Amino acid sequence: MTDKVKGTGTADDPWVLRTPPGTSEFSMHRDDSADPPELVCQVGSTKLRYLARCLDDVPTMLKKHGDWMELGSADENKPAKDGTVEAWARSPENPVKGWYGLRKGYRGRFAMYVPPLLEHLGRVELEHNAKNNRVRAR
C-alpha cells in the first residue's frame, strides 16, 4: 500500500491511518508522558490505548515467527483465533504477560490498529485485502 499517512504522531499532530482493508480511518499518537508510554488510538468517538512497547515487541515476535501471520482482530469480549497477532497480544506468553490493550472493555482490536502504524514506520509488511489480512516482519 502506498504510504499516505498524515501526521507526526504527536497529540497535536496524530498519525492518520487506515485499517488494513482500507475501509476505515483512525488516528494514533504516542504519549510518552504516560508511565509506561502509550499509543492512543482514536476511532470515531472511541479512544483505545495500547502499550507503546508493542512497536518493538511485535516486529521481534514476527521475526521469530519467520513468516506471514494472520492478524485475527477481535473485540475484547470475543476469543482471538490461535496463532494470530490478536491472540499473541493477549497471551500470558507475550513479553508483557497479557494484554497490550490498556482500557478495560476496549483492549481488543489490537491487530486492526497497531499493524498499520508498524507498516508506516517501516517495521512490517501488511496485506490489504477485504479480510483475512496477514503481516510479517521487514
Listing of model-derived features with the role each one plays in the protein:
Residues 111, 131, 136-137:
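Nucleic acid-binding interface residues in structured DNA/RNA-binding domains
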Residues 82-109:
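Short helix-coil junctions and helix-kink-helix linkers
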Residues 96-99, 116-120:
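Compact DNA/chromatin-associated regulatory and scaffold domains in nuclear/nucleoid proteins
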Residues 35-38, 98-99, 136:
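Charged, low-complexity intrinsically disordered segments and flexible loops
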Residues 119-133:
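A short, conserved structural fragment
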Residues 59, 112-116:
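Short, hydrophobic-biased segments on the C-terminal half of alpha helices
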Residues 42, 75, 86, 110-111:
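Long Lys/Arg-rich low-complexity intrinsically disordered regions in nucleic-acid-associated proteins
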Residues 2-80:
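Long, low-complexity, charged/polar intrinsically disordered regions in eukaryotic proteins
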